[in-house]
Amino acid sequence: MSDVSLKLSAKDIYEKDFEKTMARGYRREEVDAFLDDIITDYQKMADMNNEVVKLSEENHKLKKELEELRLRVATSRPQDNKNFSSNNSSSASNNVDILKRISNLEKAVFGK
């Protein structure tokens, strides 16, 4: 995921001073109000960027956990029929729990 770098921070915008000239210029109040709007937008953008990074990391973690659970299910096949019949109910229960967890993780990761 590429990080969105902003050239200016809200503080940079707030502290920016413009050179005053004798010639006619913009109304100071109008410029200040506009810069206040820009500062608010920059703060929202920074918050959203932080949230995207956090969600991306969580998504990666959940995908990794999902893959590990899939491998566990795939490798938890019975070794022989005797062992399978004696542990059938506990294995079935364990597999159902694992499959439910995989299903929940898929919903969380893929939004299905």
UniProtKB/Swiss-Prot annotation:
GO terms for cellular component: cytoplasm. The keyword Kinase does not apply. Residues 42-77 form a coiled coil. Keywords: Cell cycle, Cell division, Cell shape, Coiled coil, Cytoplasm. Its main location: cytoplasm. Gene3D superfamilies: 6.10.250.660. Residues 81-95 have a biased composition (Low complexity). Residues 74-96 are annotated as: Disordered. It is found in: Cytoplasm. InterPro entries: Cell_cycle_GpsB, DivIVA_domain, DivIVA_fam. GO terms for biological process: cell division; regulation of cell shape. Belongs to the GpsB family. Forms polymers through the coiled coil domains. Interacts with PBP1, MreC and EzrA. Divisome component that associates with the complex late in its assembly, after the Z-ring is formed, and is dependent on DivIC and PBP2B for its recruitment to the divisome. Together with EzrA, is a key component of the system that regulates PBP1 localization during cell cycle progression. Its main role could be the removal of PBP1 from the cell pole after pole maturation is completed. Also contributes to the recruitment of PBP1 to the division complex. Not essential for septum formation. This is Cell cycle protein GpsB.
